[in-house]
Regions:
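Short, Lys/Arg-rich N-terminal segment immediately upstream of the first membrane anchor
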Residues: 1-3
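Charged, low-complexity, helix-prone segments enriched in Lys/Glu/Asp/Gln
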Residues: 23-36, 72-91, 118-140, 162-174, ...
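Beta-strand-dominated extracellular/periplasmic modules and repeats
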Residues: 12-15
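Extended amphipathic alpha-helical interaction segments
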Residues: 96-205
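Extracytoplasmic/luminal low-complexity segments enriched in Pro/Gly and acidic/polar residues
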Residues: 189-228
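Leu/Val/Ala/Ile-rich N-terminal alpha-helices, chiefly Sec-type signal peptides and the beginnings
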Residues: 5-7, 18-113
């Protein structure tokens, strides 16, 4: 009888050990899968000019883990998706051909003298960039980062999330770059406003703008200097 009891105890212990081992291994595999998944996405997002948006978007919507790991994965991916969308908005605004062509003789002829179309597009671009800058600032804050993680109380998973997302990041360089571009666009707006206000005092000849008044020419040239 005693021997049977010992055997039962041994079996129970082995089952418990096996169960614990199974879940430990499963957890390790899940964490490994999570780290690999996020690392691959981050690498694909490094070269933003060559980014495959559709491919990354699909990865950001899918999950490769379960349980609390899936909660972490979804939180990280939702955070990355919002960052990606903001960067895409900035990229789209910067790639608009109106910015480099706003102060060309061709545009003066096509959209002058009031430049309604050009000025509207430039204003929309300014607004998009300014809004995106504010979004980037908000996304960089710790409170915002943590708001993506929901229904997770275990400190281990919370710490893992913090580690993988990273601490509050600085967006000073991004802010400065956006501010510089917004200021550049505003300088272009100033030039177009000047030309619109003096619409009867200039024209385009042989691909160059000509003024009827040297004072206006000097003012125009000064505005161009301010634009650089």
């Amino acid at each position: 009888m005693r021997r049977k009891i010992i055997i039962v105890i041994v079996v129970v212990v082995l089952v418990i050990v096996a169960t614990i081992t199974f879940f430990v291994i499963k957890d390790l595999q899940q964490e490994k899968s999570l780290r690999k998944e996020i690392d691959e996405i981050q690498k694909e997002m490094v070269d933003f000019e060559q980014i495959d948006v559709d491919k990354i978007s699909k990865k950001l919507k899918a999950t490769v883990t379960t349980g609390d790991y899936a909660k972490i994965e979804k939180a990280i991916k939702n955070y990355m998706a919002d960052n990606l969308n903001t960067m895409l908005t900035i990229s789209e605004a910067l790639n608009d051909e109106v910015i480099p062509n706003a102060l060309t003789a061709e545009n003066y002829q096509n959209d002058g003298p009031d430049f309604v179309k050009t000025r509207k597009i430039l204003k929309n671009t300014q607004d998009k960039l300014s809004a995106s800058k504010e979004t980037m600032i908000i996304l960089s804050k710790d409170d915002t980062v943590m708001s993506y993680l929901k229904n997770v109380d275990d400190s281990y998973y919370i710490d893992l999330y913090k580690e993988m997302v990273g601490e509050e990041s600085s967006v000073d360089d991004i802010k400065k770059n956006i501010d510089d571009i917004v200021n550049l666009i505003q300088s272009q707006q100033n030039v177009l406003e000047f030309l619109s206000e003096n619409k009867n005092m200039w024209n385009v000849q042989n691909g160059k703008i000509q003024f009827d008044d040297d004072i206006l020419l000097n003012q125009y040239n000064q505005l161009l200097v301010d634009d650089k």
